[in-house]
Amino acid sequence: MKIGNKVINYSVYVQGKKVGDTASIELPEVEILTDSIKGSGIIGEIDLPSPYQAGSMTLSISTRVSNNPDDLALLMDGKDIEVRWVTDALDSSTASTDIIGHKAFMKCIPKKIGEGKIEPGSGQDGSFEYEVLSYKRVTNGKTVLEIDKLNGIFKVNGVDKTQPINALL
């Protein structure tokens, strides 16, 4: 069994170009849309998920300073964003550590730019926020999650969860 440990390092690519001076990344949270039902035969209310209808997904990128105008321009115009990161894991059967590669590919629309705070002796701490239209997550070369809102795709470990719905359309 592998026991996940921590992120070792990461990098960000926008339109295929590596961006420096990022401090952290917050990947999208996948929340399924719901609708409440109540009435005869139901005691109370049930908040029922709508099958594979993802709510708004947001990507956040925090930066230390805005020294490089090219990086700033890339982040402000970010449409195709790729995040790569490496984690380690302890193999409980061999007591050794393994390195695991991760990638996230996102099609985005920029929606918020935070210029940060100017204070002597401190980082500027800027931020960029994006609406995510398409999200693909890969671990060690295997696609573990793929959501494309505009093309009706919702796959988990390669299994198309929307197939039964799309087959009826």
Regions found by a protein language model. Give the residues of each.
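A positional/architectural concept
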Residues: 26-54
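Catalytic micro-motifs at enzyme active sites that drive phosphoryl/nucleotidyl and oxygen chemistry
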Residues: 70-71, 91-94, 113-120
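A generic structural signal for short beta-strands and their flanking turns/coil linkers
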Residues: 8, 55-59, 77-83, 100-102, ...
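Mixed-charge, glycine-accented linear interaction segment located at domain edges/termini
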Residues: 109-169
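Beta-strand elements of well-folded, non-transmembrane domains
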Residues: 14-16, 63-67, 85-91, 106-112, ...
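Short, acidic/charged, Gly/Pro-enriched secondary-structure junctions
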Residues: 73-107
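Oligomerization/assembly interface segments of phage tail-like spikes and tubes
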Residues: 47-67, 122-135
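Polar/acidic, low-complexity leader/linker segments enriched in S/T/G and N/D
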Residues: 1-35, 164-168
